[in-house]
Amino acid sequence: MQRIYLLSDATGETVERVVRAALTQFKNVDVKLHRMSRLRTREDISLALDEAAKQPGVIFYTLVDNVLAQYLHNEANLRELEAIDLITPLLFKLASLLGIPPQKEPGLLYQLNTEYYKRMEAVDFTVKQDDGQEPRNLYKADIVLVGVSRTSKTPLSMYLAHKGYKVANVPIVLGIEPPKELYQVEKIRVVGLIIDAKRLVDIRSARLRNMRQSPRGSYADYQRVEEELDYCRKLYRKHPDWQVIDVTNKSVEESAAEILKRYDEGFPD
């Protein structure tokens, strides 16, 4: 059995992924990986190398501090251990190419990966909660958007999801009570969307034309739209702790900024 030691100043996930990716090119090999993470002082490195020397094998390491990287290299040589630096040559090449020095902050890639997976999880949740789907999961949402049809619930939901927020949206339909689960959501998380009636008629009419349908039905009828919005306003008045956003002539980005301002005030870091 061959031993491979993975040394890192952060979690060690980066060096392990690189080595595992390389190992996929070799079939039926007996290899044991030993990960040693958060090595941020000379003492940490010396202790790790002493441990590796007990059962020698090759060492792969990622240390963004080139002083510590050089120390590891020298100490490994003293112990007659083979150590391969996976990150310093890359950092030097990129620094030369970009004309700026690296930040030398351990764990940046891990932080980026964590943020990426958080966003993907939020997007997946938001897609599944679109248009009132799975109301039993409303309590899991960071933000719940409510409003009549064509008030930008879905575009807003997806925009916020890509910022890492789990968003659900619930349609408000004239004469139909929203799902009971909506009233169980923490009030500060609920955002009611409202819009000018004439603007909503224009949006719905354009939608119908794009679908090659007549805009003369009740969906884009001004009187019907007024009734829907009045029903919506009455619902919002019953729940004064809900945030209400007027999305008339606002971009998704502008509406999202208003929502997040209230959200951040209610849930400060």
Curated annotation (Swiss-Prot):
<keyword id="KW-0808">Transferase</keyword>
<dbReference type="InterPro" id="IPR005177">
    <property type="entry name" value="Kinase-pyrophosphorylase"/>
</dbReference>
<comment type="similarity">
    <text>Belongs to the pyruvate, phosphate/water dikinase regulatory protein family. PDRP subfamily.</text>
</comment>
<dbReference type="GO" id="GO:0016776">
    <property type="term" value="F:phosphotransferase activity, phosphate group as acceptor"/>
</dbReference>
<dbReference type="GO" id="GO:0004674">
    <property type="term" value="F:protein serine/threonine kinase activity"/>
</dbReference>
<dbReference type="Pfam" id="PF03618">
    <property type="entry name" value="Kinase-PPPase"/>
</dbReference>
<dbReference type="GO" id="GO:0005524">
    <property type="term" value="F:ATP binding"/>
</dbReference>
<dbReference type="GO" id="GO:0043531">
    <property type="term" value="F:ADP binding"/>
</dbReference>
<keyword id="KW-0723">Serine/threonine-protein kinase</keyword>
<keyword id="KW-0547">Nucleotide-binding</keyword>
<feature type="binding site">
    <location>
        <begin position="147"/>
        <end position="154"/>
    </location>
    <ligand>
        <name>ADP</name>
    </ligand>
</feature>
<dbReference type="InterPro" id="IPR026565">
    <property type="entry name" value="PPDK_reg"/>
</dbReference>
<keyword id="KW-0418">Kinase</keyword>
<protein>
    <recommendedName>
        <fullName>Putative pyruvate, phosphate dikinase regulatory protein</fullName>
        <ecNumber>2.7.11.32</ecNumber>
        <ecNumber>2.7.4.27</ecNumber>
    </recommendedName>
</protein>
<comment type="function">
    <text>Bifunctional serine/threonine kinase and phosphorylase involved in the regulation of the pyruvate, phosphate dikinase (PPDK) by catalyzing its phosphorylation/dephosphorylation.</text>
</comment>
